[in-house]
Amino acid sequence: MEKSKIETYLGFCVRARKIAFGADGIETLKKGVFLLVCDQSISPNSFKTIEKAREKFSCPLLMTPPDMLGALLHKPAVKAAAVKDKNLALAILSVANGDSQFKLYSGGTN
């Protein structure tokens, strides 16, 4: 199976240590988040935490299909991640805009 570009960019984030995993990990961050990525199968309480982080950091929130984020990161339990590198965040967003399975969250029901 061929790797997608988003999977490659997220892999770069992991290798560069420019990513935080999970709602609790994102909640502890103070600054420097440029993109939030969230799985649609995340629990409602964790999603509220991610929404608060989106407002706090004024960054876009990218929604993936259920259980896809864990597969992209090769960490099945991960349902949320924060990208802390501006250029990688822009690259992920540019690829996601051309792909119909990724959605930018803009508030309300998704």
How would you describe each model-predicted region?
Residues I26-T28, M68-L73:
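Short, flexible, solvent-exposed loop/turn segments with mixed acidic/basic and small polar residues
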Residues G70-N110:
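C-terminal structural segments of small proteins and small subunits
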Residues M1-T8, L104:
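Conserved catalytic alpha/beta core of Sir2/sirtuin-type deacylases, generalized to analogous enzyme cores
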Residues D24, S41, P65-M68, K86:
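Short, ordered loop/turn segments at secondary-structure junctions
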